[in-house]
C-alpha cells in the first residue's frame, strides 16, 4: 500500500468496486503493520506513514460504509456503550495455578511431576499481574472475548478487547484452525499506568493504585472508547479449545506459543525452556533481579511442563493443572507505625481487630489497614498500639502484619484490649472454648450482622435477588426499612424510591426481582440462611438428605453427621442454628412471606441406580447445561467429582474433552458421550 498515491486516491472519483478493493487492501496492510510493530518488534513504516494509511481508510469507510469489514483496524472501538456485560460460559474451564513460595515448594512440585512422568523440561515465563482473558477466533476472525470470571463463566468483553492494538482482529496467514481459543493476560504497561495517573492527577480525579487495578477497571468499562484510551497490552500464554481436533499443534508448550506468534499474537520475549532444575532456579533469580526494570508488573514466574503428552498424563486437580505452578516472588515488606486498632463485626458476628496503620506504600499499593485476625494472633505477635510493625503483602495481595520491631517500641505503647461488648450494638462479646474467634451475641439485633446477613441472603448463590447490591442493602437498613431477611418481601416499589438514586423504574424492577426470589430451592434457602460452615455444597447435601426443612430443623448432631461431607463441627453449627428461637422466627417469617420451593421426593433404591458410583463430566455439552447434568447425576445417586482417578466409575466426555479423557482411557475407566448420558436420564425419568 506504500505505493498508493494517497492524495490522488482520495481526490479521485472512485467506483464502488475500486473502493472495496482498496479498502480491503488497506485493512490487510494496516493489520500486518500492527503485527510487525506489536508482535515482531520490527516495523517497516514510520508512525506518520501508518497514520496516513489509517486516515485514508477512515475517509473511504465514511464514503463507502457498506464495505466496512469486521477486521478493519478502524473497528477496534465500538459505537454505543453497553448497558451491562453479558455472561459467557467458557468452552473449556479457565483454571488457576497452584503456588510455590520458595525452592522447597518448587522442588516438591518437581518431584511430584517426575515421579509420575519421568524427566521433564519446563517452559518458563513471567507471571504477568493483569487480567486473564479468553479470545475466540473463528475462521481467523476475532469473534468474542471474555474474562476468566469464576473459571466456568466470565463476562463478555469483546468490544473492549478489540481496542487493544497488540491483539489482531484477524489472524495472520491461512494455516490456522477453524476455531482457536487463545488465552493470555491483558495488562497495563508501567509507562501507560504512569501516564494514566498523570492525566487523572491533572484533572484532580482519583488515582489508580496499581497497574493491575487499572487494567481490570479498563477492561470492565461499558464504553469501549474509554478502554481504547487506556493503552492496554496483551501477551498470549496458552491455547484453549481448538477445532477440529485433528489440527496439527506443536508437541510442546513452547512450540504452541510460537504457533500463536506466527498467527500474529503477541508472546512474551522472556519465555525460556529449562531442561534442568538448576536452570529453573536461575531463571527465577534472573527475572526477580530484573523485575523493576521490566516494562510490566509481575508477581512471579510460571513453570509449565513443556511436553504436551506429559501434560496430558499429569492431568488436573479440581481447580488447577498438575503440570504447572506459579513460582511467586517473596512478598514485599515495609515498616510502619500501628496507630490504633478498630474492631469490625462480620455476618456471623465475628469480632475482628483491624490495625490502623500510618499509610505505607508496599507491593504496589498504599496500605493503611491490616487485619490482626483474633486475640491469639495479637498475643502471638506481642503487638501494642504505638509499635513499629513489618507489613507484608502476602502473595502480593493481602496486607499482613508479620512482626513487630521491639527495639522501636516507645514507652507510651499501650495494650490492645478486646471489647467486652459489641462496638456496633453493645451486646456481650463471647468466645467459646476451643475457638479463636470472639463473636457478638446480638444476632440480627446487631446492625452489622444484619447488613452482612442480608447481603448474603440476597447474593447470587443464595436467593439471587437481581439488583439487591451491597449499597442498596445498607441503605435499606440505615433507613430502617429492613430489619431481617423477611422484611425484604414486605418492600414495595414506592418504599424503595426513598433510596438514593432509585427511581420508580428501578424500584419496580427490584420489587419484581424480590417477588421472583420467593420461588427458590431448599438448597439455596439453606445456603441463604448463613449457617456457619454451610456453603453451597453442604447446603445441597443437607437438602438432598433430609428432603424437607421440617426434618432438618429437628435433626440431631448424630443424624446430621450421617450426611455426606458433614463432620461433627458442621453438624454442631447446624444444630445450634436451629436451636436458636430468633433464627426459627426468621425462618417462619420467610415462609409466611411466601418463600417456597418444590418438594423433594425421597429417592427409592430403584430411583438411584448410580448410588455409590463416582462420575466425572468433561468437555462441552451441547444439549445439557453442565450444572443440570451434574444435578441429574446426583439425583440418580452418583457422586460427581472434578477429576479422573482409579476410583472413577464413568467419564462423560463432551466435545474437546482433553486430558480427562486421556486419563480415563489410560486407567480403563468407562467413557460415554452426551447422547448416552441423555439416554440414561430418559430411561430413569
Swiss-Prot record:
<dbReference type="GO" id="GO:0005829">
    <property type="term" value="C:cytosol"/>
</dbReference>
<dbReference type="InterPro" id="IPR003583">
    <property type="entry name" value="Hlx-hairpin-Hlx_DNA-bd_motif"/>
</dbReference>
<keyword id="KW-0862">Zinc</keyword>
<feature type="domain" description="BRCT">
    <location>
        <begin position="605"/>
        <end position="685"/>
    </location>
</feature>
<dbReference type="Pfam" id="PF00533">
    <property type="entry name" value="BRCT"/>
</dbReference>
<dbReference type="InterPro" id="IPR018239">
    <property type="entry name" value="DNA_ligase_AS"/>
</dbReference>
<dbReference type="InterPro" id="IPR004150">
    <property type="entry name" value="NAD_DNA_ligase_OB"/>
</dbReference>
<feature type="binding site">
    <location>
        <begin position="47"/>
        <end position="51"/>
    </location>
    <ligand>
        <name>NAD(+)</name>
    </ligand>
</feature>
<dbReference type="InterPro" id="IPR036420">
    <property type="entry name" value="BRCT_dom_sf"/>
</dbReference>
<dbReference type="InterPro" id="IPR013840">
    <property type="entry name" value="DNAligase_N"/>
</dbReference>
<keyword id="KW-0460">Magnesium</keyword>
<dbReference type="GO" id="GO:0003911">
    <property type="term" value="F:DNA ligase (NAD+) activity"/>
</dbReference>
<dbReference type="Pfam" id="PF03119">
    <property type="entry name" value="DNA_ligase_ZBD"/>
</dbReference>
<dbReference type="GO" id="GO:0006281">
    <property type="term" value="P:DNA repair"/>
</dbReference>
<keyword id="KW-0479">Metal-binding</keyword>
<dbReference type="InterPro" id="IPR041663">
    <property type="entry name" value="DisA/LigA_HHH"/>
</dbReference>
<keyword id="KW-0464">Manganese</keyword>
<keyword id="KW-0234">DNA repair</keyword>
<dbReference type="InterPro" id="IPR001357">
    <property type="entry name" value="BRCT_dom"/>
</dbReference>
<dbReference type="GO" id="GO:0003677">
    <property type="term" value="F:DNA binding"/>
</dbReference>
<dbReference type="InterPro" id="IPR033136">
    <property type="entry name" value="DNA_ligase_CS"/>
</dbReference>
<dbReference type="InterPro" id="IPR012340">
    <property type="entry name" value="NA-bd_OB-fold"/>
</dbReference>
<feature type="binding site">
    <location>
        <position position="125"/>
    </location>
    <ligand>
        <name>NAD(+)</name>
    </ligand>
</feature>
<comment type="function">
    <text>DNA ligase that catalyzes the formation of phosphodiester linkages between 5'-phosphoryl and 3'-hydroxyl groups in double-stranded DNA using NAD as a coenzyme and as the energy source for the reaction. It is essential for DNA replication and repair of damaged DNA.</text>
</comment>
<feature type="binding site">
    <location>
        <position position="185"/>
    </location>
    <ligand>
        <name>NAD(+)</name>
    </ligand>
</feature>
<keyword id="KW-0436">Ligase</keyword>
<dbReference type="InterPro" id="IPR004149">
    <property type="entry name" value="Znf_DNAligase_C4"/>
</dbReference>
<comment type="similarity">
    <text>Belongs to the NAD-dependent DNA ligase family. LigA subfamily.</text>
</comment>
<dbReference type="InterPro" id="IPR013839">
    <property type="entry name" value="DNAligase_adenylation"/>
</dbReference>
<feature type="binding site">
    <location>
        <position position="422"/>
    </location>
    <ligand>
        <name>Zn(2+)</name>
    </ligand>
</feature>
<dbReference type="Pfam" id="PF01653">
    <property type="entry name" value="DNA_ligase_aden"/>
</dbReference>
<feature type="binding site">
    <location>
        <position position="440"/>
    </location>
    <ligand>
        <name>Zn(2+)</name>
    </ligand>
</feature>
<feature type="binding site">
    <location>
        <position position="328"/>
    </location>
    <ligand>
        <name>NAD(+)</name>
    </ligand>
</feature>
<feature type="binding site">
    <location>
        <position position="425"/>
    </location>
    <ligand>
        <name>Zn(2+)</name>
    </ligand>
</feature>
<protein>
    <recommendedName>
        <fullName>DNA ligase</fullName>
        <ecNumber>6.5.1.2</ecNumber>
    </recommendedName>
</protein>
<feature type="binding site">
    <location>
        <begin position="96"/>
        <end position="97"/>
    </location>
    <ligand>
        <name>NAD(+)</name>
    </ligand>
</feature>
<dbReference type="GO" id="GO:0006260">
    <property type="term" value="P:DNA replication"/>
</dbReference>
<feature type="active site" description="N6-AMP-lysine intermediate">
    <location>
        <position position="127"/>
    </location>
</feature>
<dbReference type="InterPro" id="IPR010994">
    <property type="entry name" value="RuvA_2-like"/>
</dbReference>
<dbReference type="GO" id="GO:0046872">
    <property type="term" value="F:metal ion binding"/>
</dbReference>
<keyword id="KW-0235">DNA replication</keyword>
<dbReference type="Pfam" id="PF03120">
    <property type="entry name" value="DNA_ligase_OB"/>
</dbReference>
Amino acid at each position: 500500500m506504500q505505493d498508493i498515491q494517497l492524495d490522488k486516491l482520495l481526490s479521485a472519483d472512485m467506483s464502488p468496486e475500486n473502493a472495496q478493493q482498496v479498502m480491503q487492501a488497506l485493512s490487510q496492510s494496516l493489520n500486518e503493520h500492527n503485527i510487525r510493530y506489536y508482535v515482531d518488534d520490527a516495523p517497516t513504516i514510520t508512525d506518520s506513514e501508518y497514520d496516513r494509511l489509517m486516515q485514508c481508510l477512515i475517509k473511504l469507510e465514511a464514503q463507502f460504509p457498506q464495505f466496512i469489514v469486521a477486521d478493519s483496524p478502524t473497528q477496534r472501538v465500538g459505537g454505543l456503550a453497553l448497558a451491562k456485560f453479558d455472561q459467557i460460559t467458557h468452552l473449556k474451564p479457565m483454571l488457576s495455578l497452584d503456588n510455590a513460595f520458595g525452592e522447597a515448594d518448587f522442588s516438591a512440585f518437581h518431584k511430584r511431576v517426575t515421579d509420575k512422568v519421568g524427566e521433564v523440561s519446563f517452559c518458563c515465563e513471567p507471571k504477568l499481574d493483569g487480567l486473564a482473558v479468553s479470545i475466540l477466533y473463528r475462521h481467523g476472525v476475532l469473534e468474542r472475548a471474555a474474562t476468566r470470571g469464576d473459571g466456568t463463566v466470565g463476562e463478555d468483553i469483546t468490544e473492549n478487547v478489540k481496542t487493544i492494538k497488540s491483539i489482531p482482529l484477524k489472524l495472520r496467514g491461512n494455516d490456522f484452525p477453524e476455531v482457536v481459543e487463545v488465552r493470555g493476560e491483558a495488562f497495563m504497561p508501567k509507562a501507560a499506568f504512569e501516564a494514566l495517573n498523570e492525566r487523572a492527577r491533572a484533572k484532580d480525579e482519583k488515582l489508580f493504585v496499581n497497574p493491575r487495578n487499572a487494567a481490570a477497571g479498563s477492561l470492565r468499562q461499558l464504553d469501549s472508547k474509554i478502554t481504547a484510551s487506556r493503552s492496554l497490552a496483551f501477551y498470549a500464554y496458552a491455547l484453549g479449545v481448538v477445532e477440529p481436533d485433528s489440527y496439527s499443534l506443536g508437541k510442546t508448550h513452547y512450540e504452541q506459543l510460537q504457533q500463536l506468534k506466527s498467527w500474529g499474537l503477541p508472546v512474551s520475549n522472556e519465555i525460556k525452556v529449562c531442561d534442568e532444575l538448576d536452570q529453573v532456579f536461575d531463571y527465577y533469580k534472573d527475572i526477580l533481579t530484573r523485575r523493576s526494570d521490566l516494562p510490566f508488573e509481575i508477581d512471579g514466574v510460571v513453570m509449565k511442563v513443556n511436553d504436551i503428552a506429559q501434560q496430558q498424563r499429569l492431568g488436573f486437580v479440581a481447580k488447577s493443572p498438575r503440570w504447572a505452578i506459579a513460582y511467586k516472588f517473596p512478598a514485599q515488606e515495609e515498616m510502619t507505625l500501628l496507630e490504633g486498632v478498630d474492631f469490625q463485626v462480620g455476618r456471623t458476628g465475628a469480632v475482628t481487630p483491624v490495625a490502623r496503620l500510618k499509610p505505607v506504600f508496599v507491593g504496589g499499593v498504599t496500605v493503611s489497614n491490616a487485619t490482626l485476625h483474633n486475640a491469639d494472633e495479637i498475643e502471638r505477635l506481642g503487638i501494642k498500639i504505638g509499635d513499629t510493625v513489618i507489613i507484608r503483602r502476602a502473595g502480593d495481595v493481602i496486607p499482613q502484619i508479620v512482626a513487630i520491631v521491639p527495639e522501636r517500641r516507645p514507652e507510651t505503647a499501650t495494650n490492645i484490649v478486646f471489647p467486652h461488648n459489641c462496638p456496633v450494638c453493645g451486646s456481650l462479646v463471647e468466645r467459646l472454648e476451643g475457638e479463636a474467634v470472639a463473636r457478638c451475641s446480638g444476632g440480627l439485633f446487631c446492625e452489622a450482622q444484619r447488613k452482612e446477613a442480608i447481603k448474603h441472603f440476597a447474593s447470587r448463590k443464595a436467593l439471587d435477588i437481581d439488583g439487591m447490591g451491597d449499597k442498596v442493602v445498607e441503605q435499606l437498613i440505615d433507613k430502617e426499612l429492613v430489619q431481617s431477611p423477611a422484611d425484604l418481601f414486605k418492600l414495595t416499589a414506592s418504599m424503595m424510591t426513598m433510596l438514593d438514586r432509585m427511581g420508580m423504574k428501578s424500584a419496580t424492577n427490584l420489587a419484581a426481582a424480590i417477588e421472583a426470589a420467593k420461588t427458590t430451592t431448599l438448597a439455596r434457602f439453606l445456603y441463604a440462611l448463613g449457617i456457619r460452615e454451610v456453603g453451597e455444597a453442604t447446603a445441597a447435601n443437607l437438602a438432598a438428605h433430609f428432603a424437607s426443612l421440617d426434618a432438618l430443623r429437628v435433626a440431631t448432631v448424630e443424624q446430621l453427621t450421617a450426611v455426606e461431607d458433614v463432620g461433627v463441627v458442621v453438624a454442631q453449627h447446624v444444630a445450634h442454628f436451629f436451636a436458636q428461637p430468633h433464627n426459627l422466627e426468621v425462618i417462619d417469617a420467610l415462609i409466611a412471606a411466601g418463600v417456597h420451593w418444590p418438594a423433594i421426593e425421597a429417592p427409592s433404591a430403584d430411583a438411584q441406580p448410580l448410588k455409590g458410583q463416582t462420575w466425572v463430566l468433561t468437555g462441552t455439552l451441547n444439549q445439557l447445561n453442565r450444572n443440570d447434568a451434574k444435578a441429574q447425576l446426583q439425583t440418580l445417586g452418583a457422586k460427581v467429582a472434578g477429576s479422573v482417578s482409579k476410583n472413577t466409575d464413568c467419564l462423560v466426555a463432551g466435545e474437546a474433552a482433553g486430558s480427562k479423557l486421556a486419563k480415563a482411557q489410560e486407567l480403563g475407566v468407562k467413557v460415554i458421550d452426551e447422547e448416552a448420558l441423555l439416554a440414561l436420564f430418559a430411561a430413569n425419568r
